[in-house]
């Protein structure tokens, strides 16, 4: 069922509670990356231009259900004020007399940022009384925090039970457009690049995407588990020993469906796991290649890079979720870097499914050449698994006039 978007709301002169994702990195009280604040600006500006009285709520970090100055949103209010070119009033509480007074004093076009919602135990518990207090006198609710849309918390799901109408912002709308819409009937060939550490973390998304994908390209430590399941010698590489049967089941399922499931033809090996370590590529596994005793496969090899890049070049749609190796260290970054560059050079619709893959795309400066980079981690994965996100499912249906 289609949900209301911010375009469907008449916000003029009305108090609107908006859940944003301002979970930005801080160092000594200074914001080191404001990308999440910038991502929320289109929806914020849209509502302010309409003349809404906008109340923003967010979490930051993982405080222990109580106030902690290290996780205060005060620096965010200052940065948001700079970006908007207007005063953003910061309130050092999310509910209670101070928050109520600040909200009561608002005029049309004003914006207030409440203190970290996770300073209150009622947030994660999705406590109805806390949700009701957080909504306050707002009649409209807008959720634009995709990164927490998979959490049924008071500020994402609970408040919708008390608002007249609840809608998604532009950021969530765009996430759904790509992670659901573009992948509903993807242009073929549809290639899925899957990496990361654990097969067990990706089993549901692998199963779901197998219904639509033509080819899987597998990298990261999870590739080691599949290679071990095929009987190859991986030395001291990281392997999920208790998931070998699961890996074999996935390989068999792909074969039965006629889906190509490509494992790395070779891997990049180091004898020490440290930055600056010397590395070398194994011979192709099909030609008797193996990881020597004590060696660790920490990236895909040169032949694998060549094969993966050729398949990406011919694709029409590519979904990338998970790095090919430990790209944070330059000596183990080649596989992820070259796959990212192949994706950037392709004419395919390129969708990066959040988390480490987006970090890698930024590191290798290809983000602007890709069709879409998700802002979610767990939320992206759950959406790709076909799950309904609580923060989206709770929004008002398009066919309804209210809730």
Curated annotation (Swiss-Prot):
Its EC number is 2.7.2.3. ATP binds at residues 202, 328, 354-357. It catalyses: (2R)-3-phosphoglycerate + ATP = (2R)-3-phospho-glyceroyl phosphate + ADP. The keyword Signal does not apply. GO terms for molecular function: ADP binding; ATP binding; phosphoglycerate kinase activity. Substrate binds at residues 21-23, 36, 59-62, 118, 151. GO terms for cellular component: cytosol. Pathway: Carbohydrate degradation; glycolysis; pyruvate from D-glyceraldehyde 3-phosphate: step 2/5. It holds the Pfam family PGK. The keyword Nucleotide-binding applies. Its main location: cytoplasm. CDD domains: Phosphoglycerate_kinase. It is found in: Cytoplasm. SUPFAM superfamilies: Phosphoglycerate kinase. Keywords: ATP-binding, Cytoplasm, Glycolysis, Kinase, Nucleotide-binding, Transferase. Belongs to the phosphoglycerate kinase family. Monomer. This is Phosphoglycerate kinase. It comes from Akkermansia muciniphila (strain ATCC BAA-835 / DSM 22959 / JCM 33894 / BCRC 81048 / CCUG 64013 / CIP 107961 / Muc). The lineage of its organism: Bacteria, Pseudomonadati, Verrucomicrobiota, Verrucomicrobiia, Verrucomicrobiales. The gene is pgk.
